[in-house]
């Protein structure tokens, strides 16, 4: 899948698709380096196969429009470090409502993050890792303390955006 490989190769945020001629096309968008991505990695896994099985065969047009209509604003928020905008427009009705059901403690983890510090919260790929964008690194310890009270072990890891991608060193 080009959408899995392109961020590692190009860095930043990328969007990939396959054309009608079966050509892979990738475009990249700059992401402001001030973003703090907090990966929340649990001590359990969900398989991509399992995550695909919970998806409905069809989605409502209003749900597709809800998610797709926000895309431009989400990209702009990432480019400009606009946390208030990101918080308003980050939302998904295509896969998250279904895939969250196979991620233990999803709602509890989301509630902890939203209570303490969350500009955006989403499932990373098909799961089971969750991603929380924090505005202040100082809040990571508070989140970590609350996560430790849950049944499953959640390891928070602070990540910064890779703006360069893969580098070839001679």
Question: Where in this protein do the model-derived segments appear?
Answer:
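Glycine-rich, charge-dense phosphate/pyrophosphate-binding loop(s)
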Residues: 78-170
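Short gly/pro-enriched beta-turn/loop segments at secondary-structure junctions
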Residues: 9-11, 32-35, 66-72, 81, ...
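Short beta-strand-to-loop capping motifs
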Residues: 18, 42, 132-136
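Short, solvent-exposed coil/turn elements at secondary-structure transition points
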Residues: 11, 43, 160-162
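Alpha/beta catalytic cores of group-transfer enzymes, especially the acyltransferase/condensing modules
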Residues: 1-35, 121-123, 127, 131
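Active-site rim beta-loop-alpha module in soluble metabolic enzymes
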Residues: 39-101
């Amino acid at each position: 899948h080009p959408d899995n490989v392109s961020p590692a190769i190009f860095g930043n945020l990328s969007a990939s698709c396959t054309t009608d001629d079966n050509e892979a096309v990738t475009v990249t968008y700059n992401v402001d380096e001030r973003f703090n991505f907090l990966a929340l990695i649990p001590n359990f896994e969900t398989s991509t196969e399992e995550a695909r099985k919970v998806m409905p065969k069809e989605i409502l047009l209003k749900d597709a429009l809800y998610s797709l209509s926000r895309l431009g604003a989400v990209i702009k928020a990432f480019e400009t470090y606009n946390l208030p905008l990101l918080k308003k427009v980050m939302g998904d009705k295509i896969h998250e409502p279904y895939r969250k059901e196979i991620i233990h403690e999803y709602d509890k983890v989301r509630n902890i993050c939203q209570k303490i510090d969350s500009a955006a919260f989403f499932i990373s790929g098909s799961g089971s890792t969750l991603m929380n964008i924090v505005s202040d690194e100082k809040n990571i310890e508070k989140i970590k303390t609350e996560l430790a009270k849950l049944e499953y072990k959640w390891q928070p890891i602070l990540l910064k955006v890779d703006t360069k991608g893969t580098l070839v060193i001679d």
